[in-house]
């Protein structure tokens, strides 16, 4: 009996655990694809976030006065995606920042501005700003924070006690300056105006975005300010 033992495989019947992971298994017939590698695309909703208790993420409606408490729910509101990134201890800055270190009241106002309906260009409406992204690589916390804030047209500011945010959005005027309430210089010209050069004023941009109607591939679209082009060229 000249039996030669080469190797063996042990099969252990246990239930594996994949914490903090969305795991998908797909079984396909190899005859349908031949030698080609199977590619898959998934439409994900992402993490369950902490959102205001008076907020309905599905309808984007706010009821009553917010008492400052939060509840778990799915949302693509940019402000609360930022809150999750700042306060989560596993993937975010939660080990450095606590809930009391982030100005949630400023994020509440910013989140309402993000939820306002604006024309979508096709006769309907859509939320002003949404976040449908996933973080796949480790980066510096400040870089990720800056990317989130730039998408909402806001800036992070440390006021000495908390991390707060200042957003570029329409608001009531704070003060009116005119010749009667400013110090008049010797030359008699209290106000001096400066402008950017015409060549520095951009009126066309190319936007890269994920097109769901084209297999979720990256598409490029040109967006132009036709009025500025007609005026300045």
Where do the language-model regions lie?
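A structural signal for short hydrophobic beta-strand segments in well-ordered beta-sheet cores
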Residues: 154-156
């Amino acid at each position: 009996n000249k039996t030669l033992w080469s190797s063996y495989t042990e099969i252990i019947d246990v239930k594996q655990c994949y914490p903090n992971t969305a795991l998908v298994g797909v079984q396909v017939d190899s005859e349908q694809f031949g030698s080609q590698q199977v590619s898959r695309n998934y439409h994900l909703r992402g993490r369950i976030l902490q959102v205001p208790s008076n907020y309905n993420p599905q309808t984007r409606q706010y009821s009553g006065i917010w008492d400052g408490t939060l509840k778990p729910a799915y949302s693509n509101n940019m402000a609360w995606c930022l809150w999750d990134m700042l306060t989560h201890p596993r993937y975010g800055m939660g080990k450095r920042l606590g809930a009391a270190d982030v100005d949630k009241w400023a994020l509440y106002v910013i989140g309402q501005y993000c939820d306002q309906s604006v024309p979508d260009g096709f006769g309907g409406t859509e939320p002003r700003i949404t976040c449908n992204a996933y973080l796949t690589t480790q980066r510096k916390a400040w870089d990720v924070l800056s990317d989130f804030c730039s998408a909402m047209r806001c800036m992070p500011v440390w006021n000495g006690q908390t991390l707060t945010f200042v957003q570029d959005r329409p608001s009531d005027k704070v003060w009116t300056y005119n010749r009667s309430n400013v110090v008049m210089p010797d030359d008699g010209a209290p106000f001096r105006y400066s402008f950017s050069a015409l060549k520095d004023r951009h009126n066309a941009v190319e936007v890269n975005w994920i097109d769901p109607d084209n297999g979720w591939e990256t598409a490029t679209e040109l967006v132009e300010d036709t009025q500025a082009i007609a005026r300045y060229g």
